[in-house]
């Protein structure tokens, strides 16, 4: 697939120190209305929350659902040419990553090139044969972008790095300088914070209370029968929304600065995501997951804060839930890693956030 598309190979990454007068969030805002912009913000002082990342000006887009995928590649005129394929999405992404990734160890950056975006839950259908119980929302199962510029801010050192890929189809430094100039000029654009409105009625669940209680009873019966040992009973909340999704993103980050905030400008839809929990991190040949089970509010006084932390640490229920998830993740990772290489380096670690305490394992 990649060869048929004549995709370029990244031969180098130009990395420059980069200073600007804007906050990182305001700098990213200049790109927030352009499709393919991905913003990753890190809040708190946890060891997994060191970097802010902006990926912008994509030269490749990958979108699709089911057996229909579209790879769009920017042409010499600045437009995009779409190539349809029915290739397995995981095989396609694997081929693209191998083609487009570039490991640069000069500055110990978390990323210098690659694909940014999301995988939807419905991609599970490519791996597992499970019942279809959800109403489709019309959004793609996969949405990924390859940026031509990445800005990284180190929250510890306050240093900024601008990463510009060099392709084998570039004729010299001219193309790289053009990408840098585009980015700098974009930062000079005037910008005023947007606004948004959510329905006053609030969030509406996909479950009515009787249906939810009935589902709980069904799960309990499955547990008794030995059909399952764990279930994640999920419900979907929705409300009417209008306005600037990036403004919502910034407002949520201001109120609860969790380690993993993500904004994806996907053109006809936007994704705003926040979580204190790392699902997966792959660095070289190492895979890390950080499940969280166990949450309690921060106290209003130092004494109450300490008491809440102690209560959570001693909670038998939360300990059991976290231990079960750790065992589940160990099993899942063992399926794709070397035999006897999975280990728990930290278990039931108490982490303090602005509004809550969490129990975390690594």
Predicted regions: what they are:
Residues 1-362:
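Extended alpha-helical targeting/anchoring segments
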